[in-house]
């Protein structure tokens, strides 16, 4: 038997929006012309991660905040956006747990396969850069974003995506 096939990785084509995703993108674009916020609800497995990326691109948003409930979802979303994006953007990952990404008795930097920051000044500098940029941040670390934006010279985000927001919002 031959092992040659084991080492021939197929390069996946970048995904393209399905009909339901195109409809969602157009609906969000339309609503955001008259409203400053909205809610997109899609069933599990229907491509929310890519749909939000394509919304960012359709809106030509330059400074984006993506809030996520866990580091594992942050990692997955960041990787998928970086791979599937049709436009270049810089990435900053924010995590308030200062031990993440550092070698400790209980953790190795390889446990978190991407660099993170918990430094408010670094976050503020990143937001001020004149390039397209995305900050991926856990909900638990969002206070660091708020602190960075206390500086009046730090611009607002063009678009904020709060993934799984229903898990952290109360009912009125």
Regions found by a protein language model. Name each.
Residues 1-43, 50-62, 83, 104-111, ...:
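ATP-dependent helicase/translocase motor core
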Residues 26, 75, 144, 170:
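Alpha-helical elements of the RecA-like P-loop NTPase motor core of helicases
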Residues 46-47, 72:
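ATP-binding Walker
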Residues 59, 89, 130, 155-156:
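Structured loop/turn residues at beta-strand edges in well-structured enzyme cores
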Residues 60-86, 92-100, 139-141:
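Conserved Walker A/P-loop ATP-binding site and its immediately adjacent core
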Residues 93-120, 138-144, 167-169:
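Conserved helicase motor
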Residues 128-146:
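Conserved two-lobed SF2 helicase motor
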Residues 139-141, 151-172:
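SF2 helicase catalytic motif II
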